[in-house]
């Protein structure tokens, strides 16, 4: 599946992973989660992954628990 991966622990748990460096950092984050590739999306504000496993949680507006 495709989507925005989320921070798994800490103060920003449930938030999108911010794209603070470049496409390579997002690609690495996605591959750690067994995705095919990742890149900066939405005006370079968040990482977006393609090809994630079905059980990987991704950020959705409806289930947003981010409270940075």
From Swiss-Prot:
Localization per record: Secreted
Chief subcellular location equals secreted
The entry's note on the tissues where this protein occurs is:
Expressed by the venom gland.
Q: Does the keyword Secreted apply?
A: yes
Q: Where are the transmembrane segments?
A: none
Q: Which domain of life is it from?
A: Eukaryota
Q: Which UniProt keywords apply?
A: Disulfide bond, Ion channel impairing toxin, Neurotoxin, Secreted, Toxin, Voltage-gated sodium channel impairing toxin
Q: Where is the LCN-type CS-alpha/beta domain?
A: 1-67
GO CC aspect terms: extracellular region
GO BP field: defense response
* Assigned protein family: Belongs to the long (4 C-C) scorpion toxin superfamily. Sodium channel inhibitor family. Beta subfamily.
Record's domain comment?
A: Has the structural arrangement of an alpha-helix connected to antiparallel beta-sheets by disulfide bonds (CS-alpha/beta).
Q: How is this protein named in the record?
A: Beta-toxin Im-2
* Lineage of source species: Eukaryota, Metazoa, Ecdysozoa, Arthropoda, Chelicerata
């Amino acid at each position: 599946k495709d989507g925005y991966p989320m921070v798994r622990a800490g103060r920003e748990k449930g938030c999108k992973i911010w794209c603070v460096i470049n496409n390579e950092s997002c690609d690495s984050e996605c591959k750690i989660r067994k995705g095919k590739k990742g890149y900066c999306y939405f005006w370079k504000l968040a990482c977006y992954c393609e090809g994630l496993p079905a059980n990987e949680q991704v950020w959705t507006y409806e289930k947003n628990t981010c409270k940075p």
